[in-house]
């Protein structure tokens, strides 16, 4: 799975939190403290689209963008990728389970049946 750079993550956080699609100009306004050019945001959005993180709506002008998957789906994919890359999956799972709270452990038990 492709990783996110710092600006990519900032844009994705906005898209994940937004109930509606966003244009590059919307994102520029929401990230005004960074003083980014619209072209910079468009470049980042293009990269995110190429990586499969965003979907561009071509029927509106300016184009509007939405997250291709929820934040939770993205995080689950990352967890699965990490586990898949382990040479000793059991050791990784043991370490993970050893670090979860009692409430999270109960949730895991419930989900596993």
Over which residues does each language-model region extend?
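Short, cationic-aromatic polyanion-contact patches
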Residues: 4-7, 59-78
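Pre-recognition alpha-helix immediately N-terminal to the DNA-recognition helix
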Residues: 9-14, 26
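Short helix-capping/hinge SLiMs at alpha-helix to coil transitions
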Residues: 15-21, 69
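Short acidic, hydrophobic short linear motifs in intrinsically disordered regions
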Residues: 21-30
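Short, hydrophobic-biased segments on the C-terminal half of alpha helices
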Residues: 42-46
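A short, conserved structural fragment
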Residues: 49-59
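Amphipathic alpha-helical dimerization/coiled-coil segments
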Residues: 77-113
């Amino acid at each position: 799975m492709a990783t996110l750079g710092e600006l990519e993550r900032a844009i994705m956080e906005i898209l994940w939190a937004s109930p509606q699609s966003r244009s590059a100009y919307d994102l520029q306004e929401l990230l005004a403290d960074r003083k980014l050019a619209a072209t910079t945001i468009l470049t980042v959005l293009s990269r995110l689209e190429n990586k499969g993180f965003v979907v561009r709506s071509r029927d509106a002008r300016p184009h509007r963008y939405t997250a291709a998957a929820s934040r939770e789906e993205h995080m689950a994919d990352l967890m699965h990728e990490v586990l898949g890359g382990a040479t000793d999956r059991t050791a990784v799972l043991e370490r993970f389970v050893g670090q979860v709270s009692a409430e999270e452990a109960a949730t895991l038990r419930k989900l596993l049946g």
